[in-house]
Amino acid sequence: MIGDITAASKIYIVCGYTDMRKSIDGLCAIIEDKFSMNPKASILYLFCGKRCDRIKALLWEGDGFVLLYKRMAVDGRFRWPRNKDEIKYITWQQFDWLITGLALEQPKAFKPASECGKLTTSA
């Protein structure tokens, strides 16, 4: 199905600035050449330009690429990490935060139970 991002096994964001004039082939070249990753993996790759008001998402669907584009409404900005030359894995929760304009790290958010440590019971 076109644009079903839930089919992605992982999400990676390309930190820093990306030239938003790039299309599928240019974004694939960044993934392959700069980060030595496979753009045809079941991974959602996210890119952001200097203005931080639009992002592109690239996903391989098995028979072709899907390129998604989101532009924030008036004065909206994405909180994008600017570490140059880095690609970063993010969770689906972080993706939700990012896509709505929040920062990737939300210190006051509840952590999933798997990150809180093991619970012990006493007999």
Which stretches of residues belong to each language-model region?
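Polybasic/polar functional segments that serve as interface/processing modules
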Residues: 1-123
